Amino acid sequence: MKQRVLVASNRGPVSYQFDADGSLAGQRGGGGMIAGVTEGLVALGPEADVTWICAALSDADRVAAALQLAAARAGVREEGGIRVRMLDIPPDIFDRAYNNVANSALWFVHHLLFDTPTQPQFGHEFQRDWESYLTYNETFADALAQRAREALSGEVGQGRPPSGGPRILIQDYHLCLVPRMLRERLGGAARDVGIGHFSHTPWAPPDYYRMLPEQVGRALLDGILGADHAGFHAERWATAFVQCCAAILGAEVAPAGATWRVTYRGHVTEVAVHPLGVDAPALRERARAGDVQAHVSMLRAAAADRKLIVRVDRTELSKNIVRGLVAYRELLATRPQWRGRVVHLAFAYPSRSALAEYRAYTDRVRRLAREITEEFGTPDWDPLILEVKDDYPRSLAACAVADVLLVNPVRDGMNLVAQEGPVLSERGCALVLSREAGAAATLAADALLVNPYDITETAEALHQALAMPDAERQRRSAALAAVAAADPPARWLGGQLAALRS
């Protein structure tokens, strides 16, 4: 039977920009979630009927969305075998929903980022922002309901049974309310579709989650419990979610083998863990391309046979770049034997520059990098190379040449870099990994786990990684790569679809 899949996410698989002549140019959307979902959908094969609904994020996206409305299939455009529908949400609504609620409140709660003596402060302005978040989610629910009804009516017209109805995959904290809204819009037809929600972030424990206003916290949980299946990257995040459901909503929670069954408002939601790894063959093939190999040559020349500590992150508060740099400074201060023998490549992608906290954080990263270079650098040795720009080939090259990979988030839903590094490593890399990354659940056996807040422990782990015998480093790296390749995007997404079919 032909698979019908609807995907909904804030960011889509394609984004647009204006060329010099004013024409639209499309490019693949960025981010680990986009890559994972896209690769999983491609693995379904050409017979799958896939529509991806996303928000128009830029002026160019909004023009593209308007042009799509004139297409034969209103609002739908083909992109690499996936039909994409961009929703033109009013900019003020989008800004308040995305920046003020999703990124400034929900992201901070789930990553435990608030400076609690002064933050958060939920007042009348936040209530206005919350109304925008409601509107934003309603827009997605309306679009999904329309597409689901079209799919169901097509099946009835062609004599197909309703069990072949669409499976709907709703992504992340931007769209927590959509599952319940969609179920209410579909009414009785909801039994003929499968509604799934996946959280790519951690989930806050109940005591911290209660920081949100009561009606907001309850609405988010109730929204996700409108789904038939709710997925998380790691067991600890799924456990925190069901604990919140029990403590805050009074929902009935029961373990069911490797999953949980949460009963609320007469509906049962299955909560399960789906770790996301990497497509190792595709990743290695991409790394063999000329643009990546050119960066490999440049990085090796810059290192001049010195050992390389590599990090690849967004300039995101939770990625903990500042403490990572401080740990590197402590390594050089307390282990002088590494001076002149190691280079730290810190490659970062600009992130959320619309938020003042992120601009200040990026400035602090740049300032700290300068201080380390001024303190330890010599005429023939730059201890640190920091680049803050979007350069995917450079990032792949850095992973390929790394002797040590530093991944030290204060909290992370999964973290793909920790898995991509060992897969791409040419000589074997030692992984220094935060115990607070979701990936630690699968990679702990062969990584050097650290408390991301402990600078001294991180510096010592960097020393151990640098001093690790080649044979041990290569053995660990191979084991890490095997684990990372065991849960490729096709398996990750296929597991969710299978759960919805059951």
Spans of model-derived segments:
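Catalytic cores of carbohydrate-active enzymes across secretory and cytosolic contexts
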Residues: M1-S502
